[in-house]
Structures are given as structure tokens and as C-alpha cells.
């Protein structure tokens, strides 16, 4: 099997010309969690994500054109991350709802805001963000793009 950390990899060569990007968007992220039921309840009630079932009884959280596939720790599906652990995700999610509406929803469910609202830089420009944690202690940043 190819070892991507091997010193002999061609991608390490400084003589290679940078390639054009071959990726256009993110489809899904696999999130390893302690308890799938707690996770689906949190994300559906707090953020309004749609819980879907696929390939038998696997669960996903759908939003926009993306989704989080859920793996319960110790019951992951192959292939999987080298070291899948709950609480290791740090992700920024974009909302089109007023950020105040997200803040009110968090307050209504007693979810503490760790930081924010604060200005940050998103993939497409300035964003206003709040930070909070899910039941596995993953760091969630919910942001809206700043319009002039």
C-alpha cells in the first residue's frame, strides 16, 4: 500500500509545477460520535438539519447540498479515518438566516455560546461568526457573510 508520508513521494518534489485545482465543492464529512441519537436530536432541533437514513440503518444530517455522515465510535464503516474520535471536528457552517435567529435558538435550548459574534474571514470574504459545541464537544462555527 502507498504510504502518503513516505519521503519518496513525487508530490514532495519541489521541481513539480503546481497543478490546477481538481475539486469543486465538499459533498460530505464523516463525523464520529459517541451517540447517534443524541447527535441527530441536537443537529435537527438546534440547527434544523434533516436526519436521513441510507444503506440500511446508517444516519446522515443533511443541509443544503452537503451532509454529515455519522459513525458511532467503535462501530465505524470502512474505509474510515486513521484515528476517528468524537470531538475532533472544527467546522464553519454558513447560514442565510439572521445570526440573531441562530443565537436565539441556542439560548432557547440552553446551548452556551463560546465566542461571538465576532468577525472572521470565510472562504468568500468577511463573515460574522458565533462558536458553540455539540454533545461530543465538536466546535461549531455558524456564520453569515457580511454584506456592505
Curated annotation (Swiss-Prot):
Record Gene3D superfamilies: 2,3-Dihydroxybiphenyl 1,2-Dioxygenase, domain 1
Family the entry assigns: Belongs to the glyoxalase I family.
Span of domain VOC: 25-145
Protein name: Glyoxalase domain-containing protein 5
PROSITE patterns: VOC
Annotated source species: Mus musculus
Pfam families listed in its UniProt record: Glyoxalase (PF00903)
Amino acid at each position: 500500500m502507498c504510504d502518503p508520508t513516505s519521503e519518496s513521494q513525487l508530490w514532495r518534489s519541489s521541481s513539480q509545477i503546481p497543478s490546477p485545482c481538481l475539486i469543486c465543492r465538499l459533498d460530505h464529512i464523516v463525523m464520529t460520535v459517541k451517540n447517534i441519537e443524541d447527535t441527530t436530536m441536537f443537529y435537527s432541533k438546534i440547527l434544523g438539519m434533516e436526519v436521513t437514513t441510507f444503506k440500511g440503518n446508517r444516519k446522515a444530517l443533511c443541509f443544503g447540498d452537503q451532509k454529515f455522515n455519522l459513525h458511532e465510535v467503535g462501530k465505524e464503516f470502512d474505509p474510515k479515518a486513521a484515528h476517528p474520535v468524537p470531538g475532533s471536528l472544527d467546522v464553519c457552517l454558513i447560514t442565510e438566516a439572521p445570526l440573531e435567529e441562530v443565537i436565539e435558538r441556542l439560548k432557547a435550548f440552553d446551548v452556551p455560546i463560546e465566542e461571538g459574534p465576532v468577525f472572521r474571514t470565510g472562504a468568500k470574504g468577511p463573515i460574522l461568526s458565533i462558536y458553540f459545541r455539540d454533545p461530543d464537544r465538536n466546535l461549531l462555527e455558524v456564520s453569515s457573510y457580511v454584506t456592505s
